[in-house]
């Protein structure tokens, strides 16, 4: 043995810094009716009817107006104490007839429930049957689709409310029209995205030569200021587009939690194949989407999009390390948005 001394190492010390604040403070967390209303305003000639108090409509419209800087039509049954005690079915019947009389081009009314109307147990499906008979008597030449949308705020969020409204509207309209001749089109459910995202998706499909219907088409929510601009802003998705979804070549759902259930409905009811990919944020998710489009439609990915991909990769290789090296990221948002952004963070 040498004269070396045995050194006993002290155990490592871990110091925890006190947290002065929470990671999330007062997060944006809206109720189901808010998401249902956003889905409804994405349809042309559609006015959502919220069966509840005025606040369930007023504050949501304010949220949309502040974000998009546009005006939107959303109606309310203005439920009060009497209806809360004795039932509010009559308010729905009155609201539907008032909308039909005031808007001659109206074709879709999603009837969106709230906490109060779900708790008191209003029979929305039965009320819709009464409304349909009244509409047939007063407006025999018109067809207005009434879709029941059950969105109590005591569960879920605006994300689940959006998905529920889309599914109910598609079920109501597609069941009324049935399946026709194959259209060769592609159904696309991008989920809760902004107008610029819809414009970009349309360009992708145009570059690939794919005829696609995007649900819900909110491109006009960022419409230019033109002389003939309407006071109210509406979506571009028409009743014919929704009815034609049953005849599509396939469905591409870009949001697992904001439209995929409607794709499942079309597959189960009309045998339209449903394909699910992540929302195309970042290189990998966009690659997956374009490959799936090519697989379903038989179209090739054009050189123009391959070049764009190369430019994006070059930018990441040149600059990403300068901004993202050794950085920590916190992501909070819609589930599909978080999945997409998390994948992008892994890429850089």
Swiss-Prot record:
GO terms for biological process, alphabetical: nitrogen fixation
Catalytic activity: N2 + 8 reduced [2Fe-2S]-[ferredoxin] + 16 ATP + 16 H2O = H2 + 8 oxidized [2Fe-2S]-[ferredoxin] + 2 NH4(+) + 16 ADP + 16 phosphate + 6 H(+)
The record's free-text note on cofactor binding: Binds 1 [8Fe-7S] cluster per heterodimer.
Residues reported to bind [8Fe-7S] cluster: 31, 56, 115, 153
Record-level Gene Ontology MF annotations: ATP binding; iron-sulfur cluster binding; metal ion binding; nitrogenase activity
Pfam families, per the entry: Oxidored_nitro
Superkingdom in the source lineage: Bacteria
Needed co-factor(s): [8Fe-7S] cluster
EC number of the protein: 1.18.6.1
InterPro entries: ChlB/BchB/BchZ (IPR050152), Nase/OxRdtase_comp1 (IPR000510), Nase_comp1_CS (IPR000318)
Alphabetical keyword list: ATP-binding, Iron, Iron-sulfur, Metal-binding, Nitrogen fixation, Nucleotide-binding, Oxidoreductase
Annotated function: This vanadium-iron protein is part of the nitrogenase complex that catalyzes the key enzymatic reactions in nitrogen fixation.
Subunit field text: Hexamer of two alpha, two beta, and two delta chains.
Family: Belongs to the NifD/NifK/NifE/NifN family.
The protein's name in its UniProt record: Nitrogenase vanadium-iron protein beta chain
Record organism: Azotobacter salinestris
């Amino acid at each position: 043995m040498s004269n070396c001394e045995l050194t006993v190492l002290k155990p490592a010390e871990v110091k925890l810094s006190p947290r002065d604040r929470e990671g999330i403070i007062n997060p944006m967390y809206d109720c189901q009716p808010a998401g249902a209303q956003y889905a409804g305003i994405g349809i042309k000639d559609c006015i959502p009817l919220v069966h509840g108090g005025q606040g369930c409509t007023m504050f949501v419209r304010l949220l949309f107006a502040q974000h998009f800087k546009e005006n939107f039509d959303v109606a309310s049954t203005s439920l009060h104490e009497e209806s809360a005690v004795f039932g509010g079915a009559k308010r729905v019947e009155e609201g539907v007839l008032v909308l039909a009389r005031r808007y001659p081009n109206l074709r879709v009314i999603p009837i969106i429930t709230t906490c109060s109307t779900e708790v008191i147990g209003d029979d929305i499906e039965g009320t819709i049957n009464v409304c349909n008979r009244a509409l047939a008597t007063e407006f025999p030449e018109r067809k207005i689709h009434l879709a029941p949308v059950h969105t109590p705020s005591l569960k879920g969020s605006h994300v689940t409310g959006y998905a529920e409204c889309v599914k109910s509207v598609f079920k109501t309209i597609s069941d009324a029209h049935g399946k026709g001749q194959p259209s060769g089109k592609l159904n696309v459910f991008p989920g809760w995205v902004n107008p610029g995202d819809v414009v970009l998706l349309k360009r992708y499909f145009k570059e690939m030569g794919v005829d696609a219907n995007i649900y819900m088409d909110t491109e006009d929510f960022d419409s230019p200021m033109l002389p003939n601009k309407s006071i109210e802003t509406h979506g571009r998705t028409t009743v014919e587009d929704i009815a034609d979804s049953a005849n599509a070549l396939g469905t591409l759902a870009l949001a697992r939690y904001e439209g995929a259930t409607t794709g499942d409905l079309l597959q189960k009811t009309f045998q339209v194949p449903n394909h699910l990919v992540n929302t195309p944020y970042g290189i990998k998710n966009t690659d997956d989407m374009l490959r799936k489009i090519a697989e379903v439609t038989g179209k090739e990915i054009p050189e123009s999009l391959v070049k764009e991909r190369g430019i994006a990769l070059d930018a990441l290789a040149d600059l990403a390390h300068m901004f993202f090296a050794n950085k920590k990221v916190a992501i909070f948002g819609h589930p599909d948005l978080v999945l997409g952004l998390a994948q992008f963070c892994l890429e850089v």
